[in-house]
Curated annotation (Swiss-Prot):
A GO molecular-function annotation: translation release factor activity, codon specific
Main localization category: cytoplasm
Keyword GTP-binding: no
Origin superkingdom: Bacteria
Modification type N5-methylglutamine: residues: 252
GO cellular component, one term: cytoplasm
Post-translational modification: Methylated by PrmC. Methylation increases the termination efficiency of RF2.
Described function: Peptide chain release factor 2 directs the termination of translation in response to the peptide chain termination codons UGA and UAA.
The name this protein goes by in its record: Peptide chain release factor 2
Keyword flag Cytoplasm: yes
Family: Belongs to the prokaryotic/mitochondrial release factor family.
């Protein structure tokens, strides 16, 4: 094997060894054993919330361990591939090309796994609460907000992460004014928090009779889901509860009872709505979870020197954009912070955003070290 390839394999081995140490593979195996024991308890499903948490954590831990073990097995097999290529004779060139392709693919997969070790923030391990709001751009902006919502939900589905939609406020003509949903997966907050900010879309408007180019904006906010250890207690007298009928696209009612709930936190003026559950009680519980997350954000912001610690600065306008999605006159999605770009917007809008997430996490880590 050539010295350059030996050096590449040695470098990958060093990186993967560091990943195995930081992620504590032995501890991960012990955690899986503990969760499997909990999952085998016949009484587990008496508590639906606990059962879902245990099974979700178990699935994630098993997937993480399987991914690391597969990377180690592939790395161990790589020198053998090069040895076999050298013995191929006439087919040596093709076999060598296959080994080089595996080396390249393995490097990308190990680097992607390495990103997970950078999620060490106080709340990074939490599930994520995502809110999307349409900004400047009229009906195109509302449509753009709905496209972003679909993008994140598709990303979650591709990773088999459960998504729970709490509220969707539909615009009159098309799209949404806002939406709030949770991504139930460990480290969802640490991963998706780099998506906070204003996302800009440039395209030929499907709503313009003259087919003119339109620029639209939408804002993405990502918060950590609140846990009992956060001690976010809300006195009953601090919250005003209003109920109303759920509405769908175009403002049409989708429920004959007043099941939708609007919570107003009187001391701060924070307003939260939830209408996606079937009962008023379920909507109230979900809305309270969102309100707690927003109050946690407010608490953290007050404790930090920079107000944008959890929330992107400013509103949905040109000067605050963090990523640009151009569909016309050319095809490009570019992150303005990391310079990471992709020439296939269709794939990105269908949930293929891991490259942007990894680049964003590395960018944030460098910023924190400065």
């Amino acid at each position: 094997m050539e010295p350059d390839r030996q050096a590449d394999i040695a470098a990958l081995d060093s990186t993967l060894t560091t990943v195995e140490r930081v992620l504590d593979v032995d501890g991960l195996r012990a955690r899986i054993e503990k969760l499997e024991h909990e999952a085998s308890d016949p009484q587990l499903w008496d508590d639906q919330a606990r059962a879902q948490r245990v099974t979700s954590e178990l699935s994630h831990a098993q997937g993480e361990l399987r991914r690391i073990e597969e990377l180690r097995a592939r790395l161990d097999d790589l020198p053998v591939l090069y040895e076999l290529a050298a013995e191929e004779g006439e087919g040596a060139a093709e076999a060598l090309a296959e080994a080089d392709a595996e080396l390249k693919a393995l490097r990308a997969d190990i680097e992607a796994t390495e990103v997970r070790t950078l999620l060490s923030g106080e709340y990074d391990e939490r599930e994520a609460l995502v809110t999307i709001r349409s900004g400047a751009g009229g009906v195109d902006a509302a449509d753009w907000a709905e496209m972003l919502m679909r993008m994140y939900i598709r990303w979650a589905e591709q990773h088999k992460y459960p998504v729970e939609v709490f509220d969707t406020s539909y615009a009159e003509e098309a799209g949404i004014k806002s939406a709030t949903f949770a991504v139930h997966a460990p480290f969802a907050y640490g991963t998706l928090s780099v998506e906070q900010g204003t996302h800009r879309l440039v395209r030929i408007s499907p709503f313009d009779n003259q087919s003119r180019r339109q620029t639209s904006f939408a804002e993405v906010e990502v918060l950590p889901v609140v846990e009992t250890t956060d001690h976010i207690d809300i006195p009953e007298g601090d919250v005003r509860v209003d109920v109303y009928r759920s509405s769908g696209p175009g403002g049409q009612s989708v429920n004959t009872t007043d099941s939708a709930v609007r919570l107003t936190h009187i001391p701060t003026g924070i307003v939260v709505t939830c209408q996606n559950e079937k009962s008023q009680l379920q909507n109230k519980i979900s809305a309270m979870r969102v309100l707690q997350a927003k109050l946690l954000e407010r608490k953290r912001s007050e404790e930090r020197a920079e107000l944008d610690a959890l929330k992107g600065e400013g509103g949905s306008s040109w000067g605050n954009q963090m990523r640009s999605y151009v569909l016309h006159p050319y095809q490009m999605v570019k992150d303005l912070r990391t310079e990471y770009e992709v020439g296939n917007p269709a794939a990105v809008l269908d949930g293929d955003i891991d490259g942007f997430l990894e680049a964003g996490i590395r960018w944030r880590n460098r910023k924190d070290d400065e």
